[in-house]
């Protein structure tokens, strides 16, 4: 049985197809900073770490509650990057509207889209067979030595 990559120009799952991947669904609704950070890391090709993107999302989420939903503007920029990368249509409506009214569903859809296209956000930017230090954001949040570990890991790994 051979598998073909999904065609460019169309989404592999719908906005409300959250239950096709229970992990991304639960994370997107209970702790959206984690799947969003993973998506941002993949879309930025490692230039933004999972932890940093997730932390910024949380700060914007709580800072903008009273005035403007700042996190929607931040997350819709990544939806635009994803759409540009795979030539996806703005469905079901404009990117900012999707993130404003269906934020967790939109984050879950972005996560699933990358996963269905072969770039598993849970693995970070690394190939599936290698250990990724930024894959679950644990090191960023728990270790004060994160940057030293990451620098040494890249030195050993890429030599």
Curated annotation (Swiss-Prot):
<keyword id="KW-0472">Membrane</keyword>
<keyword id="KW-1133">Transmembrane helix</keyword>
<feature type="transmembrane region" description="Helical">
    <location>
        <begin position="52"/>
        <end position="74"/>
    </location>
</feature>
<keyword id="KW-0812">Transmembrane</keyword>
<comment type="similarity">
    <text>Belongs to the cornifelin family.</text>
</comment>
<dbReference type="InterPro" id="IPR006461">
    <property type="entry name" value="PLAC_motif_containing"/>
</dbReference>
<protein>
    <recommendedName>
        <fullName>Cell number regulator 4</fullName>
    </recommendedName>
</protein>
<dbReference type="GO" id="GO:0016020">
    <property type="term" value="C:membrane"/>
</dbReference>
<dbReference type="Pfam" id="PF04749">
    <property type="entry name" value="PLAC8"/>
</dbReference>
